[in-house]
Amino acid sequence: MKHMILVPAIALSTAVLFSADKNPKREKIRKAILEQYDANDNGTLDGEERALILKTHDANGNGKMDRGERLALVKAVANKQKPKARADGEGDQKDDEASIWNTTGFKQANSMGGGEAAIPKSGKFRVFVLMGQSNMTGAARAKELKPPYTEKHDRIRIWANGRWEYFVPSVRFGPGVSMARQLAAFWPDDTIGIIKVASGGTGIRGFEKNWSFERANLTFDGKKGSLYKDLMNAVAEAKRMSKPEFSGFVWKQGGADGTKKVLGTEYYDIFKQLISDVRKDLGAPDLPVFMPSYMNDEDLLKAVRRILSDEELRKIRNLAGKPPVKDADLLAAVLAHLNEASPAKLRKAFGKRPYIAAVIAAQNRAGRELPNVATIYPGELPRIGGGNNHINAEGQIQLGKITASAVGEFYKAKR
């Protein structure tokens, strides 16, 4: 097994540590620091992430990284990556065990742990699997959270750092925070567990059970490795140390698959297979699935009709059937027409995700046709702003509550 060996960096300034560098040794150091502290996986160290580094390594408390403190940071990162030498070879084995939790899929969840926590013996241990891209990972700032979301809860756990921990975000957060709180209130005698495997900008092929670098790399995600394998590693270990009752799968993803025609066209079939695989491998054949999406068929139809001429609409209606035509049928005809439109026309309407309408339609179809799959429509949620598609702190709290309400309605109907 190869291990990155970091060189001493006594002369490196803080700016060099955090900035790209043409010197290969210094760049290796920077990437190692980024790998450890980039909690939201956006490829840079944001203010909160740099503040965490400063808080951890500012030994003299002067508010800046001095020469010796920078060296200590580099050594700390190096020691985390290198296995301890053991005559019996146990060091390599333990390093391999640790490495399965230091993956892209777990990076943000690892930053949300608030210390190891035992699972209460009373009641059920209801575990929810959360997967998706950036708005599941969460770009909302943890410093904007207010009580009770900043406090440990006796009956809420998150899978972090290869174990069950209290759920207390320290850098960024997604919808799981408020969702878990509301579900704990819904089931006052049970404990809520969250297993989150998510990575910003990841296409659905990055989550497939039958993962391959080539397929994942259609959305440039090959280097992230198999996120499904991450999930199964967590499930196996969680089963070993606790008795989880898998109670739901939450999927917040789609934007990355709106970039290419083939991605949008195949989305439904891949999602259907993903759900089948998750249910089988979790041993929960009827596992309910909750998928927050962007808009329902009616709103999506309104959105795509804006870019069509009256003549195009007449032709499409004739293909769809005699009026009155169901929204789903008309939408299918519209999307078939748009699938043959020029990419330039679609980019003019949908920006850098010209085929996003096909993805949204596939998610809506899944909610209609697949058993125990609910597509959720939270509406327009508050965003960070500045052209950023990421949901802000207020929006993530709303999304978590809306998702928890959908879970509650599902289980109420079963009573």
Predicted regions: what they are:
Residues 28, 44-51, 65-74:
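Alpha-helical segments with a strong preference for the paired helices of cellulosomal dockerin domains
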Residues 86-415:
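Cell-envelope and extracellular/periplasmic
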Residues 7-15:
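Bacterial N-terminal signal peptides
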Residues 22-23, 27-28, 74-88:
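Intrinsically disordered, low-complexity Ser/Thr-rich linker and spacer segments
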Residues 20-36, 47-55:
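EF-hand Ca2+-binding helix-loop-helix modules
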Residues 56, 62-83:
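EF-hand and EF-hand-like Ca2+-sensor regions
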Residues 38-42, 60-62:
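Acidic carboxylate motifs that coordinate Ca2+ or other divalent cations, activating on Asp/Glu
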Residues 1-5:
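Positively charged n-region of N-terminal signal peptides that target proteins for export
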